[in-house]
Amino acid sequence: MGRLGYWTLLVLPALLVWRDPAQNAAAEKGPPALNIAVLLGHSHDVTERELRNLWGPEQATGLPLDVNVVALLMNRTDPKSLITHVCDLMSGARIHGLVFGDDTDQEAVAQMLDFISSQTFIPILGIHGGASMIMADKDPTSTFFQFGASIQQQATVMLKIMQDYDWHVFSLVTTIFPGYRDFISFIKTTVDNSFVGWDMQNVITLDTSFEDAKTQVQLKKIHSSVILLYCSKDEAVLILSEARSLGLTGYDFFWIVPSLVSGNTELIPKEFPSGLISVSYDDWDYSLEARVRDGLGILTTAASSMLEKFSYIPEAKASCYGQAEKPETPLHTLHQFMVNVTWDGKDLSFTEEGYQVHPRLVVIVLNKDREWEKVGKWENQTLSLRHAVWPRYKSFSDCEPDDNHLSIVTLEEAPFVIVEDIDPLTETCVRNTVPCRKFVKINNSTNEGMNVKKCCKGFCIDILKKLSRTVKFTYDLYLVTNGKHGKKVNNVWNGMIGEVVYQRAVMAVGSLTINEERSEVVDFSVPFVETGISVMVSRSNGTVSPSAFLEPFSASVWVMMFVMLLIVSAIAVFVFEYFSPVGYNRNLAKGKAPHGPSFTIGKAIWLLWGLVFNNSVPVQNPKGTTSKIMVSVWAFFAVIFLASYTANLAAFMIQEEFVDQVTGLSDKKFQRPHDYSPPFRFGTVPNGSTERNIRNNYPYMHQYMTRFNQRGVEDALVSLKTGKLDAFIYDAAVLNYKAGRDEGCKLVTIGSGYIFASTGYGIALQKGSPWKRQIDLALLQFVGDGEMEELETLWLTGICHNEKNEVMSSQLDIDNMAGVFYMLAAAMALSLITFIWEHLFYWKLRFCFTGVCSDRPGLLFSISRGIYSCIHGVHIEEKKKSPDFNLTGSQSNMLKLLRSAKNISNMSNMNSSRMDSPKRATDFIQRGSLIVDMVSDKGNLIYSDNRSFQGKDSIFGDNMNELQTFVANRHKDNLSNYVFQGQHPLTLNESNPNTVEVAVSTESKGNSRPRQLWKKSMESLRQDSLNQNPVSQRDEKTAENRTHSLKSPRYLPEEVAHSDISETSSRATCHREPDNNKNHKTKDNFKRSMASKYPKDCSDVDRTYMKTKASSPRDKIYTIDGEKEPSFHLDPPQFVENITLPENVGFPDTYQDHNENFRKGDSTLPMNRNPLHNEDGLPNNDQYKLYAKHFTLKDKGSPHSEGSDRYRQNSTHCRSCLSNLPTYSGHFTMRSPFKCDACLRMGNLYDIDEDQMLQETGNPATREEVYQQDWSQNNALQFQKNKLRINRQHSYDNILDKPREIDLSRPSRSISLKDRERLLEGNLYGSLFSVPSSKLLGNKSSLFPQGLEDSKRSKSLLPDHASDNPFLHTYGDDQRLVIGRCPSDPYKHSLPSQAVNDSYLRSSLRSTASYCSRDSRGHSDVYISEHVMPYAANKNTMYSTPRVLNSCSNRRVYKKMPSIESDV
């Protein structure tokens, strides 16, 4: 150091200490001062001012210290000069810390600084040169920190370099330089505890103080290509020179040294060979200025932390001069706060040994230009290297290059080259893979990146390994950086071809297609794989058509099934059953039950439909043999049809996968993609042979597909599956592999891998390469030995190719069954429309169809009548004016029917029946026109004292809804045979049989009009009336009385509990209140008659009649009684408005004859018919003439003589016109079932009862056939000849029909045998079926030539009264519980206990008075037994006339006339 430098050191302390007194005072009050010295070697291009300016106000912001930087440059850095400068600086400036950097590569500098620090306790930072070099065995009390890495950290990086390049075999060479033991120990420990397959062959420790001969002997032990060297830089020169003489430097040897050997990178000894690898502290990216700044930051940060914690900074030693004393270690030093320091966002922490925790190390190599080159970086425990393949350097000019080690480039493309990550545990490549390096970009803008170690395998990798063993070469494998095969762009080749052309690689191995353009710049080997261009498409899930469930059969088959076969077969079954002699009552055969179950076309279609689909639906099976055969054949057809449908259904319900069909590159989809909607989308990977081929041969196609090109094969596969691409054009070998290994096998190649522009894959070598011939011979050998075929089977065959014939089943989704759900939805919509139309028709439109709107016969009636006329050939005379369809019109028609009768029976000796009348018959004035007034709805009845009959006040409101409620709640009223308004028992005028007198009240009750099909021709009625009696003018109705009281004249409400659903229309009638009855009232006249003079069972009317009989010209009375309901309906009476419930309830006694032997001696008279009354045939007893209905078989106590006296009259009457039929011997207790000739002729005009077509062809029953069996108690249980047997058929007779008792020539068709047996078991009425018909006639001989046509009158099998019927529940049952027990109940309940022969001969008739009492009182029930009564009228016509229903009768008749209209 010169004189100037010496004087500077003497004056500097004085300058630092001297201050102005004011400044000293301020300093005492200000923050504590921190003095830091910076000493650098003079060789650095930096001045002291620049060093002081490195710490400015911006760095001191936020610090509680006043930092003073003292900068000093030194010319010499030898140990003596270094100690002198530091001691002088400490004596003058009292520094707290020192930042030291030199430009030497001598580790002695670090040792001197460590000594000073341990003596003065001043923290010293060695930031550069020898001060930062590795130092072993530091003083424990030292506070010396270095910007460098420890021996262990550098050894770790050296092993990482060998691991990345797979240099697992190595040798270790060291000297006795301090720290070598630590280095050897760490290497051995790491190798022994690592999963990497390290092989440390030799550990050689040299002593350079001996002769060179011994060094050479030890170096000759090295047989590995990788050598780790730990020594000083001077020792390394000696060792490397000896290694060169031994041939241990060159292409195949890699020397790796720590930073001790490299030292100062600017000083490179000539003995260092090219390719020498060193791990050094980063001098390239970490400048000296940055290191100084970081050193200052570390010291100030540690001082601030100490000040914050202890509120003081330790004072430094004033001088290092003086007598040596034993140093005392302070309790708290700055060293403790320098271990964990973070400055300027960087972790600058130090270890306990004084080295950085995260040093910035780099890998440098001595290149061929003899310069250190940075090739890698260690940062954050990660090593990144520049070269994918470590470059082979020519160490010296006299070294020969090694041509057997090749650099090979490849391209990732499965299955030829598959790239995988290294094993995370061993950090190496597993078996059957080779190491390969892949370049990964870190910064896309600067293309900066790093090579990452990967593992490669695949078809081409296996070929490469075979070639390496056969041809004898080694290689380094790396992946092409741009991921392309090779294309010439701007006269520059890229991809694998570019690597070979520009000699960065010796050869290129992979899926490289041989073509003419590439062959011009590189040499190709023989093809090892045949390939070309192919097209890959994706299978798309096909949609299932909504009509898929119909596709198992063609449209013609469905038409034949549902239109032809079903309809035709149903019609055939119906026709066979219609005309079958043993079928249902649909063929109008003679003798069949007129209202039995019918077999319609609808039932036939329903039966066949149920058979087709095996539905468990209730059907009605035919009974005819022919129709059964037809149904059986249809059932066999249904089995075949359904089985065939089920077998083919699965094939049409699955989703068929759709694949685009492409024939080749010339396909229209490729050449004219815009012709499709949407346009056909296809593409390829650019810069390949496929794109070049398309560009050269199909320019338009190439121009179109550029927008759909893909970056790689994997991206193309994803685009195919997601629908972004319709077709992918690429190498056939790759596409076949991808199709075979695709998950789900959704990707397929067209034509099962059809190839266009066939070519092959080859290995590209540099032009004129000496390896070409050897590689060609090896490849041909592989093909000949079958090794190539084995590799193809291993890598190129996929699992999808083996599963082409496998059937894959899947669950049916909603798309598969969509058509069936659509059909159900359509059916529900159609049902809703039908439901709305049904209600619209019922409430709005049906009146016009039934003729209410036009006051003419309705359309349905006309169609039904026309069908009947066509089938039976009956001429129906058109009327000029249709009958009135209101209530008055119905009564007028019945009046004309009564007037058209030839004779009216003159009945006398009317018995006082159970007519609960509040008024006597004598109170009324006899008027011949009473019927006309009643029918005309005038209500002009008067008493004998000229008082008007007062109507009752209505107990119900005038609201029509109440009436509709009553109609809806009615239970047992049969509106088809309802009574007239104010109706009461008929009293026939005895003196004048042509006049009718009826006791009628003015109470207006709504009655139903008869069915239109039962109406008689107005012309015929008029003609008959003219022949018998002129038509009275009273039956001409006024216009105001022609009102429509019913909504429909065709359908009449039936009994809800009894009616048949198929034939009943429950419609409410409109009640009409007469004008003259609004304010009339009547008195409650319930009386109990005194039965002293007259019979006890006579009512008031009967007794009144008997009293006045002597002065009356009447001779006969015809009354009809039916069963009565118990008194007082809790539910309002139907069709009654003016009703007053009596306060005192009385139940009339029931007259019954308890003598079972009465009249058993009577005989049957010959059959005759007299239009007039047969007075001779009448009994002499006037008391009970023709009105003995109160006496039944229960009257066992009556004497025979009394019964003979009371029931001695032997004539019957016409049930319609009431004319007498006296020639028949029999006493009738109720209305006759027979008609006269006139009524028979009139009844045939509009009546379309099917029974009219039945001719009585049965043979007359002989006496033996009829009376051949003897019954027990024959005389007591004989049928009384005066007991008329009238059978009443309930609506449930259609369910259980009565067998034919009389006509044995025709079988019964009531029910099927199976149902009959089920119903007969344990049935109270089951005995009816088993009684012989011959027993029904007793022992009397038949007097009729045609047999007993009793089957025309069916008797209900079930009890007639609700109390005896276990299946019905009436409102009367509830009434009895509320009001009390009816006096007639004992008789009603005792009836079923009679004899067996009597149980099935009993019928219940509702008395006329039960519904027609003047005060609408409650009714009582009577039970009478009837004779089995044959018809007495001569059957001189073709048709037998059914019973005419008229409104004057109160008999409950549930039998409904059949209608073809209901079946149509």
Curated annotation (Swiss-Prot):
Effect ascribed to mutating residue 233 to A/R: Nearly abolishes inhibition by Zn(2+)
Transmembrane segments: 555-575, 625-646, 815-835
Gene3D superfamilies: 3.40.50.2300, Periplasmic binding protein-like II
Tissues of expression: Detected in brain cortex, olfactory bulb, hippocampus including the dentate gyrus, striatum, thalamus, superior colliculus, inferior colliculus, midbrain and cerebellum (at protein level). Detected in brain cortex, hypothalamus and cerebellum.
Listed SMART domains: Lig_chan-Glu_bd, PBPe
Motif PDZ-binding boundaries: 1462-1464
Origin superkingdom: Eukaryota
Membrane topology: Multi-pass membrane protein
Stated consequence of mutating residue 264 to W: Nearly abolishes inhibition by Zn(2+)
Cystine pairings recorded for this chain: 87-320, 429-455, 436-456, 745-800
Effect of residue 734 to A: Decreased sensitivity to glutamate
UniProt region (Pore-forming), positions on chain: 599-620
Intramembrane ranges, chain numbering: 601-615
Endpoints of the signal sequence: 1-22
The reaction(s) this protein catalyses: Ca(2+)(in) = Ca(2+)(out); Na(+)(in) = Na(+)(out); K(+)(in) = K(+)(out)
Compartments, record wording: Cell projection, Dendritic spine; Cell membrane; Synapse; Postsynaptic cell membrane
Outcome after substituting residue 416 to A: Decreased sensitivity to glutamate
Residues exposed to the Cytoplasmic side: 576-600, 616-624, 836-1464
Summary of subunit composition and partner proteins: Heterotetramer. Forms heterotetrameric channels composed of two GluN1/zeta subunits (GRIN1), and two identical GluN2/epsilon subunits (GRIN2A, GRIN2B, GRIN2C or GRIN2D) or GluN3 subunits (GRIN3A or GRIN3B) (in vitro). Can also form heterotetrameric channels that contain at least two GluN1 subunits and at least two different GluN2 subunits (or a combination of one GluN2 and one GluN3 subunits) (in vitro). In vivo, the subunit composition may depend on the expression levels of the different subunits. Found in a complex with GRIN1, GRIN3A and PPP2CB. Found in a complex with GRIN1 and GRIN3B.
Name recorded for this polypeptide: Glutamate receptor ionotropic, NMDA 2A
